[in-house]
A protein has these predicted regions:
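Intrinsically disordered, low-complexity regulatory segments in ankyrin-centric signaling systems
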Residues: 1-28, 37-40, 60
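Ankyrin repeat domain, specifically the short helix-to-loop turn at the C-terminus of the second helix
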Residues: 23-31, 56-64, 89-97, 122-131, ...
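Conserved ankyrin/ankyrin-like repeat signature
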Residues: 21, 53-54, 86-87, 119-120, ...
Length: 201
């Protein structure tokens, strides 16, 4: 089998969730971190497809869990973006780099806060030392994202409370100098404004 055919077979095995085929390709000498045209490794493909047993197998076999594809996805960031708590719990013990950025310059907790992924946010805050005050490319912290980009509903209120309880700075402004409290009030998110006030905003 040619090297190219072996790579194709390996990445297809990840796509299909076929551990035996992954194992066979590795035994034939395929590079575990080889990528397709989108710069996706087998572990990124398996993560996107929710083939959890394959992800576990590839971690145990030494796959690079931090390598990112051309849209900045890696297993850790995929779990945060897609609300995949199972994947997150598989990846965290492998000690992923929590400072890897999404294509918008956020860390994992940034999109999770924005999208209302309560359990992901809770897991990150309770199990990791991820930077709760990281500022992304547009100048927003996870707290600002949780307020500005969503509907202010129950999930967002819970996320705001979790962030504040774990050290989110209620005084960090956006790039226009607006505080979380000002933004919450502008949007009519009174419950979030109350949480911010209780946290000393």
């Amino acid at each position: 089998m040619s090297a190219t055919a072996l790579v194709t077979e390996f990445l297809l095995a990840a796509e299909e969730g076929n551990i035996d085929a992954l194992k066979a390709c590795l035994e034939k000498g395929v590079d575990i971190n080889v990528t397709n045209r989108q710069k996706r490794t087998a572990i990124i493909i398996a993560s996107l497809k929710k083939h959890y047993a394959c992800v576990e197998f590839l971690i145990a076999a030494g796959a690079d869990i931090d390598k990112q594809d051309q849209t900045c996805f890696n297993p850790f960031l995929i779990s945060c973006l897609t609300n995949d708590l199972t994947l997150l719990r598989i990846v965290l013990p492998a000690d992923p780099d929590l400072d890897r950025l999404t294509r918008f310059g956020g860390v994992g907790i940034t999109p999770a806060s924005e999208k209302g992924h309560v359990e992901i946010v809770r897991e990150l805050l309770e199990k990791t030392d991820i930077n709760v005050n990281h500022t992304n490319f547009v100048g927003w912290t996870p707290l600002l994202e949780a307020i500005v980009v969503n509907d202010g509903g129950a999930k967002q209120q819970e996320i705001v409370k979790l962030l504040l309880d774990h050290g989110a700075n209620p005084h960090m402004t956006d790039k226009y100098g607006k505080t979380p409290l000002e933004l919450a009030r502008e949007k009519g998110f009174n419950a979030i404004a109350d949480l911010l006030l209780a946290a000393g905003a």
